[in-house]
């Protein structure tokens, strides 16, 4: 377990991703460095009204403290009171073009230490894609990149983390997946630190290859008010998921995290309307019937 | 304790409020009646793209069941497994004009029964106002109507329920009140059923007088893109409160309530932007400095 090594990787990952996205967009991200009064801090990189990205944030944070609050360890009461350290990179990008999907990626590391005891640590992370208008080839490309990221660690990871992603990014109050999925994992600490770190690093390292080709392909497709309107409506689901179900968002907001960094994930313009659904057979209906179905995008086995 | 009497009152209240609002707006509400598979149902009255109201809903629901789930009674474990019955009217109105405030009102009744035991019951409710551009006279008018509603039940209620409202409608992650407050109460079952019912009824009955004069005064004020933009930004706070902190919304969504009726409270068009605050001294800044301060709008005592 080497925390400094993980932190260095995360700082570098954030820089590489922001630089890569700036090359695509042509507009620079704003960079805000902030301190956490209780220990640690972070850097939030934000783009708004870019050429391609309507709103997006790539956030790095590294927080630590002396006594882990009981609320943070409900599932592991034996960790209460331990010193802790957590670091991660988290991003959400909302392109302007309704044919380009929203994307989310996160890699994170947590460690709880106590003198005279073995440190307890785990990795978590993943990435998932949320289209407004679905393209089968985009979904396949994204899942292939997820699989490529995990394959070096072992055959078993992609199917397991793909399923975990479908289960996690699910709006129970809508009985609806958030998007076409990807991969998600948490509590990863087996078989050893090096294997877990390599796997997590590979997920972060594959992000640009997973997303940028899709963004490039869709960024300049012509669209009109109808598509923008549907995008704004569907973005409401993103808000609902993040504020009602996402554990990271809720924990951050309820535990005094930096609100503006946490809510960078929310879309720039959102609409709600009552009991609306798209006309059967329309391109909008196709999103529900063909894409928000938890299907397998890659041939299994 | 007479449940039928409460239910009749609530059905009538919904009708009176919807009729009153239709007279103001000139457009009819859509009325949807729905059943709850586990027992009960409701009527949702919705307006969208009205002449004055951009989006609004007035919801009546009456639900019952045989065994109260433990999750619903965390604070009162002795009620688990009892038969229960709950009814309420809940409304949120989002006017189009940014000078007209958003308003919320709710009155509700809950009863848990068991053969051979005294029924356990309580009332809850209140109303609160959320301006985008504040007007002192509107805040005073609204609070005066709240006080008028409670005064017949006793001097002590308005100050107590005003404070409770300020505490409840508070965005902890923003350190910011949702609006200029009003009144809020819950668990009301003293001194007796008749007193509690009268008080709750008076709150419901005062809603139109509390809000309609404000709406009429502001509905036709001239505004431009700047004011609409600030309104959309501030509406984001409404979404954040309702999805992150509001117990009724969260419980409804997480317990299989009717999603479209619960989320009628969300605004039609919402914007999020990073780390934004209004220029010092601007009309937008005045909202924060002069109105979102938990102040007393009526002379005390």
Curated annotation (Swiss-Prot), chains A, B:
Gene3D superfamilies: Coproporphyrinogen III oxidase, aerobic. GO terms for cellular component: cytoplasm. A divalent metal cation binds at residues 94, 104, 143, 173. The gene is hemF. The lineage of its organism: Bacteria, Pseudomonadati, Pseudomonadota, Betaproteobacteria, Nitrosomonadales. This is Oxygen-dependent coproporphyrinogen-III oxidase. It is found in: Cytoplasm. It catalyses: coproporphyrinogen III + O2 + 2 H(+) = protoporphyrinogen IX + 2 CO2 + 2 H2O. Homodimer. Pathway: Porphyrin-containing compound metabolism; protoporphyrin-IX biosynthesis; protoporphyrinogen-IX from coproporphyrinogen-III (O2 route): step 1/1. It comes from Nitrosomonas europaea (strain ATCC 19718 / CIP 103999 / KCTC 2705 / NBRC 14298). It holds the Pfam family Coprogen_oxidas. GO terms for biological process: protoporphyrinogen IX biosynthetic process. GO terms for molecular function: coproporphyrinogen oxidase activity; metal ion binding; protein homodimerization activity.
